[in-house]
Amino acid sequence: MKDYYSENGFEEIFEEKGSTSSNISDNCASRDYDVNISSDNPRLLDSYRPKGNYGRDRNSPLSRHIGVPNQEIILQGLTPEILEEHIELALYATGAKVSTVTLIREKETQKSRCFAFAKFVSLQDSKDWMEANFPTLVIDGIDVSVRFSRAAREQIEGWCCQNCDILNYSYRESCFKCRVPRNQASIAIGNHKISKRNGDMDVSDVPSVYLILRNLDRSLSEETLWKGLSKLEIDVQRVFMIRYKFNDAFCGYAILEFKDVDESAKALMKARTYPGKGFTLASRKVSVDYIHDGVLIPAYTESARWQFPTKTGYLVYWDPELYCSIYVPEGIDTDQFKPIEVNKKPKKEKRARSSNYIDVPASKKVATSLQRWNDAQKELKDNIPDLSEEEEKLLLHFVWKSALICVLCERKFQSWGHVVKHITQSIMHNNNLKNHELVSSAELLMHRVRQTESVDYRDRATERRIVPAASSDTIVEAKKSSQGSSFHSTSNVSMKMLNSMGWNKGSGLGTNENGIKEAIQPTMYLPGVGLGNKGSKIQINMTPVDRVKDRARSLYFQNDKNNNL
């Protein structure tokens, strides 16, 4: 097995293919390359770049560079008509364990750019396949150049200064610009991508309990930062210093937590109006601002090492590569930061729904009037306590039943259910029962109410219509006539019309005299009864005794009818 990753390995490959370093140089000259390649300097094979489209030339020396081993390989020199399926079949035929194949196309025309990428299942699979098939693969009778993709390059040697974000050579022990030692302000370049993280993306103008301090010296510690904040004379609850997870290096900005928004606003005003050159820490002017809501986010899947508690739950910093190093000043109670546990109320058993409620399918929108009707029914029917006779006499002592008024509290209600709720659950009613002055005045008023309700009803309107000189017998007859129907009165306009049409008393209406024989009695709805309810209508002129008789008569005929059936 040849070692393709050494310089001798390249020379052996070129000799097998009938090429030498000299004719490679001639080939490069004929193709107008920038670099002159000679046998004395074979290392230039890895660094030269052609001026033209190198991906289309499968015979160029660049295509014979195997590259840095990784899971992806690049296939160059494909025909424009080839598809991903053809590439997959060719790779599977050679025993390649490929997971995905991506053919690169033009964005506008979607035409093939004649090169593709193939990703293997593992790094070892790609190495084994390249050792067996490098440098070409035959697809549809055409030799296609294969090598490792350039995505995985060798790690850059060097380190980045955390204090000034300047790249330094690996042999430097201190930053050449700010002279900070390497062990205090360095990040190894390689697996971690270096980007400027200075807190500029966390700034907001919306007031909150958090303030962000930017442009801090990256060599500061928690104690040093806290001592510098003491000159502002502010009440800080916690200090969050933003650090990298992989080496705990300070990023140069921190977040302060206050008790409420008023405290943070005072601290912001003090920092921005600080006398002299402004608010400084370690001889550096510090920028102070609010943070937005997306800086500290809920910790759903984050490790417990990086999250911190608050009253609303556990939070983490939004950047996955950074975390908050917490410093709590002396004298601050840490129990106040624990999340508040919410006790879940046990689910109550569902009560049987009343037949008065109107069921509506969940998929349809409930009309406003229908929803209002259901809510009113629930309010009247639900949670009304049952009272015994003794309790009712005691509790309803100050209730004007006919008017639905609590005389003691001087409150009028819309339904009997509201009255019962008031006398059993109202705190005001219980307090008024202990007030002797209110109780005595309510007793007097209820005495008058009972006297008024005990007097028989007099139809004073009918009495005023009667001639003053009439006898008592005439008054009684007029009273009876007012309670009865006015259908039989001869002075009635309707009666005169019927008589002129030939109608006789006792016969039915209509040509065949098969219509109604009795007058239609005027009726009204009982108060508090819903529309359509059976027995909701009563005659206007009927007394309570007549109503009981009419009800008994209807029940008798109904039972008699059922027995006959």
Curated annotation (Swiss-Prot):
Keyword Aminoacyl-tRNA synthetase tagged: no
Keywords from the UniProt entry: Metal-binding, Nucleus, Repeat, RNA-binding, Zinc, Zinc-finger
Zn-finger (C2H2-type) residues: 404-429
Domain (RRM) ranges: 71-151, 209-293
GO CC terms, sorted: nucleus
Compartment(s) of residence: Nucleus
PROSITE patterns: G_PATCH, RRM, ZF_RANBP2_1, ZF_RANBP2_2
SUPFAM superfamilies, per the entry: RNA-binding domain, RBD (SSF54928)
Disulfide bonds: none
BP GO terms, sorted: mRNA splicing, via spliceosome; regulation of heterochromatin formation; regulation of mRNA cis splicing, via spliceosome
Superkingdom of origin: Eukaryota
Matches recorded under CDD domains: RRM1_RRM2_RBM5_like (cd12313)
The keyword Ribosomal protein appears for this protein: no
A Pfam family of this chain: G-patch
Protein name as it appears in the record: Uncharacterized RNA-binding protein C57A7.13
Organism the protein comes from: Schizosaccharomyces pombe (strain 972 / ATCC 24843) (Fission yeast)
